[in-house]
């Protein structure tokens, strides 16, 4: 009985550890009002340990971080997405090229204007890839929703 219990416990712990390794990026999404009917959308990635997330202009080889937004007639996008964080640029052994990426944390900021005073949402998907010194995980698509406007 003890062997079965210990075996089950080890399998559960290994599965938990593997799940943590396979999801080294946590995303948060917020909207910050900066003027009347004008907001900044903050799509913030917190990156675990020695992993790094590639920039929107990642360089040759790695999959860059991209955002795709669902059309919303109440939202007008103003400019390009800005990256706020410590951008690193170095030779990437995984791709044998110079790459641009972020470790620890990066905030992707998109300015939007709301065409009405009623609350609405911005929906989209972020596609990203993470690597460490030994391996890369396949690119992932993560859908998100950000509440914007209203009172």
Q: What annotation goes with each model-predicted range?
A:
Residues 18-151:
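Extracellular/lumen-exposed scaffold segments
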């Amino acid at each position: 009985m003890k062997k079965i219990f210990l075996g089950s416990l080890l399998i559960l712990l290994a599965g938990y550890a593997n799940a943590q390794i396979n999801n080294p990026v946590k995303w948060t999404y917020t909207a910050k009002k900066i003027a009347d009917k004008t907001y900044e959308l903050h799509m913030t990635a917190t990156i675990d340990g020695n992993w790094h997330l590639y920039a929107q202009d990642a360089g040759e080889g790695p999959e860059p971080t991209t955002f795709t937004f669902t059309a919303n007639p109440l939202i007008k996008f103003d400019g390009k997405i800005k990256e706020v964080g410590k951008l690193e640029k170095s030779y990437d052994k995984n791709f044998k090229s110079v790459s641009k990426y972020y470790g620890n944390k990066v905030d992707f900021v998109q300015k939007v204007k709301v065409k009405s005073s009623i609350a609405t949402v911005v929906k989209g998907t972020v596609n990203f890839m993470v690597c460490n010194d030994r391996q890369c995980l396949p690119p992932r698509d993560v859908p998100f929703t950000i509440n914007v406007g209203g009172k």
